[in-house]
Amino acid sequence: MKKQMNARLIGAFAVAFAVGTVALAAPADDTLTERNKAVVRDFYTTVLIGRNVDAAPRFLRQDYIQHNPQVPTGLKGFMDTFRQRFAQKLPSDYKRELLNVVGDKDMVVIYMRQTWTGSDGQHHQALGFDMFRVQDGMIAEHWDAD
């Protein structure tokens, strides 16, 4: 069931990025969509690319729902998990890039790339999608495909 859901999410994300937009929205929805995209973009840039876990409360609700089973639900669970992850040493050339952000009202999807050189000397790349639901200017929910 989970693999089926992940396959559906990946398919939906691929279509959204191939088209370049999720949906046509009314002008009021465009403003909401742009604000929500900015929240997610700023969160991703500040907290995940910038590795600044202490900034997470500016972006995540206390009751943040995390659908990735490797990260506990709630702001505290997110912060505890990412403090541990960010304490781990990364390859010197590790890079995380935000490639695209699309949204429709309260739903925002990002497309990102991670690159690094492994201990084997080989260059590695990982591409991923993350989907967020924004509520009242704060990230309320997160899904990802791996």
What are these regions (language model features)?
Residues 2-12:
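Bacterial N-terminal signal peptides that target proteins for export
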Residues 53-104:
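A solvent-exposed, acidic/Ser-Thr-rich amphipathic alpha-helical stretch
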Residues 20-58, 62:
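Short, low-complexity N-terminal intrinsically disordered segments enriched in polar/charged residues
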Residues 127-146:
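Short beta-strand edge/turn micro-motifs at domain boundaries
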Residues 101-108, 133-139:
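A short, structured loop/turn motif at beta-sheet edges
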Residues 88-91, 116-124:
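Short, cysteine-centered beta-strand-loop-beta hairpins and adjacent loop/turn segments enriched
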Residues 82, 96-101, 113-114, 127-132:
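Hydrophobic/aromatic beta-strand elements that line small-molecule binding cavities or substrate pockets
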Residues 11-21:
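Bacterial N-terminal signal peptides
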